[in-house]
């Protein structure tokens, strides 16, 4: 019997732009880390950027298991938490750093579900979490993208399509589908394609047994020229889906 040819989803170069953002090193323990760091930040008064940074780094070092953490990893934690979750606001011109309302909310309410809802509601592209060199491409491509909002819209549109076919199934999304059909398609992230069109594409791809990750696809190549793994390709969409689960969305 002849081997069945694998059919891959093909997104033309002109529509491809890989969405990426800061990924915390502590993601496997994110709930405990965020609750701890929110509390520690709220104990630091408004002070100079240097003083706040010292107190903040010391708080990271005192988190259980971090006492012998390498300096580079400590610095990664230091930049990742404010970049992604905005736990403090640094004004270098005035030389003052203040703990943010997001950190205060989490510390006072101890409500991770609501915290992640607030986070996802405001997390967008372009956004303050991005590096300047990445912002240039996002703006040039006219990308205006709120990941969680778009995912919810696609799920709702998918439910309508399934219901119209008398299906009792509910729409779902895998990290691969979210990566290739939503995150990395400029037509979606710039609002040129409706959520209903995205949902239809995904459902059609399932029906036609279309695969997504293809190590031979030039889009999978890293800067070194090696192919990224499936996990590398889908990690950002996977993160947002995980955060949505924590937000009970």
Locate predicted features.
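Donor-sugar nucleotide-binding helix/loop cap in glycosyltransferases
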Residues: 2-249
């Amino acid at each position: 019997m002849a081997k069945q040819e694998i059919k891959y989803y093909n997104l033309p170069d002109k529509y491809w732009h890989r969405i990426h953002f800061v990924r915390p090193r502590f993601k496997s323990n994110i709930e405990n880390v965020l609750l701890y760091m929110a509390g520690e930040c709220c104990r630091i008064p408004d002070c100079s950027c240097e003083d706040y940074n010292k107190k903040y780094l010391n708080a990271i070092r005192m988190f259980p298991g971090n006492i012998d953490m390498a300096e580079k990893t400590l610095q990664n934690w230091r930049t990742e938490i404010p970049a992604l979750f905005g736990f403090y606001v640094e004004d270098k011109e005035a030389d003052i750093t203040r703990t943010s309302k997001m950190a205060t909310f989490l510390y006072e309410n101890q409500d991770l579900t609501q915290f992640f809802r607030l986070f996802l509601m405001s997390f967008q592209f372009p956004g303050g979490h991005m590096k300047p060199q990445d912002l240039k491409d996002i703006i040039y491509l006219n990308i205006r993208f709120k990941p969680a909002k778009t995912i919810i819209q696609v799920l709702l549109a998918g439910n309508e399509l399934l219901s119209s076919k008398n299906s009792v199934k509910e729409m779902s999304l895998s990290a691969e589908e979210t990566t290739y059909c939503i995150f990395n398609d400029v037509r979606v992230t710039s609002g040129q394609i409706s959520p209903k069109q995205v949902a239809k594409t995904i459902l059609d791809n399932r029906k036609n047994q279309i695969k997504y990750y293809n190590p031979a696809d030039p889009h999978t190549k890293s800067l070194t020229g090696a192919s990224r793994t499936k996990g590398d390709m889908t990690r950002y969409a996977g993160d947002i889906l995980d955060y949505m689960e924590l937000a009970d969305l």
